[in-house]
Amino acid sequence: MTSTTEPMTDLHIAQQAVLHPIFDIADAAGIPEEALEQYGRYKAKVDVRKVPDSGRAGRVVLVTAVSPTPAGEGKSTTTVGLADSLNRAFEQEGTGRRSMIALREPSLGPTLGMKGGATGGGYSQVLPMDEINLHFTGDLHAINSANNALCALIDNHIYQGNVLNIDPRRITFKRVLDMNDRALREVVIGLGGPTQGVPRQDGFDITVASEIMAVFCLATDLNDLKSRIGKITFGYNYDRQPLTVAGLGVEGVLTLLLKEAIKPNLVQTLAGTAALVHGGPFANIAHGCNSVIATSLARRRADVVVTEAGFGADLGAEKYMDIKSRFADVAPSAVVIVATIRALKMHGGVPKTELSVSDVAALRRGVTNLARHISNVRQFGLDPVVSINRFTSDSEEELDWLVSWCESQGVSIAIADVWGRGGGGDDLAAKVLAALDAPSDFRHLYELELPVKEKIELIAQKIYGAERVEFSSSALKRIAEISANGWDSLPVCMAKTQYSFSDDASLLGAPSGFVLHVRDLVPKTGAGFIVALTGAVMTMPGLPKQPAALKMDVDAEGNSVGLS
């Protein structure tokens, strides 16, 4: 369809789009029809075992961003717009090269909470937008089911005699729900008498924070998924020895519940670019990257794979480099940092209500946030491309200043209007292709042999800018347990507010000299990392005062209303 800069809602643009049958999208991406399992006309799962090798080994472009603000940055929008622009450039070349997208699935909790949707925006969306944002192909339901089946099996084992000597006080594996529901953070189960189970304190996490989700996204195939599920530590016995899913003997049934969900989902952008949307861990409380299986499949079918990692480069991008890239051959060859004039001014102290007013002084103050993210990406041996997601309120003076600043830092920069013009990222695509052709020296931030405590301190000081890390007594006790159980060599997954480099969400810009507070650690032995909980970050979010859900509805014809 023809793009226009006329203001329209994301949902209206999506509903007016003319979609291609999913078989056509698959054919253009080199995915054979026999590998597809249709979910309607425009969605399909892909059986990767039936996709032949193409000889391609696509290079990965990782899209990340500055520290997020309520003003919005447009990372997913840029990811989609960049892939569309790359495909347009490849078509003009006539060389047969192609790009694909690998994205995370939206979580229903944030969709109904603050975000309202997570499929891009404007003329740079993945479609069908409303179906992807709601139940999609049921992957999160399957992950819910596997997670909660494990919880039920643990409690049943205790009730039926407790042969494993499970200590109910030391069960670390929680139930999950794909919803923001603060009332479920701490609960007591098993009440009502001796036939109702064994009473104990429990709690719920949001599904995207669960270890089942992490295992799902890091597994390389079905067998690896089963192996990782078996390695999950769900608690400890009365002798304080760790207990695993394999010890309980239920890794088989949990894998069975996930055998269809593990197949990547194929959809399309508004411009017809193939998109694999699969898995969805948060980057503030989990590792924040889509599934290894989807990214690896995209690399087999495309020359350039555009993917994203959640929130700012201090969270999702760091975890992509230090966690996901260790488990699979998906290391990025180029990195894009998405920024907006509005977000940088907010980091410079401008309230949201005044962001439309031109203010180069505030931009100068707030650019320190972008500067640190650039520096952080360079620590991994990669020179990032900065993409300015343009808004109509951006003044030419502000844009000129930011371009000049980036050039003074030796940073490639492109101004993109992918929201209003779909593939309006031609300059960004050219800069990214140049970055892919430039020499790079990808490296991890730390060696796995370092003790967990030192890894946390290194991330806090080198990436966040902290002066030191303060560990609670509980955290120190957990570190000793981790070392005693031989888990010291696992990478670290920091759980931290997304809004600041610190653990205080109100400290915007690029704070330094602060103390990072680690209150606890959770070994995720199936996923293969240690979660370090900092500050007041929650693994079960709550809804805001005015949830996005209040604007959502369905009309008499069954069309979605209010998604964005």
Swiss-Prot record:
The keyword Nucleotide-binding applies. GO terms for molecular function: ATP binding; formate-tetrahydrofolate ligase activity. It comes from the Bacteria. The keyword Cell membrane does not apply. ATP binds at residues 69-76. One of its GO terms (biological process) is tetrahydrofolate interconversion. Its EC number is 6.3.4.3. Keywords: ATP-binding, Ligase, Nucleotide-binding, One-carbon metabolism. This is Formate--tetrahydrofolate ligase. PROSITE patterns: FTHFS_1 (PS00721), FTHFS_2 (PS00722). It catalyses: (6S)-5,6,7,8-tetrahydrofolate + formate + ATP = (6R)-10-formyltetrahydrofolate + ADP + phosphate. Pathway: One-carbon metabolism; tetrahydrofolate interconversion. Coiled coil: none annotated. It comes from Renibacterium salmoninarum (strain ATCC 33209 / DSM 20767 / JCM 11484 / NBRC 15589 / NCIMB 2235). Belongs to the formate--tetrahydrofolate ligase family. It is an enzyme of class 6 (ligase). Pfam families: FTHFS.
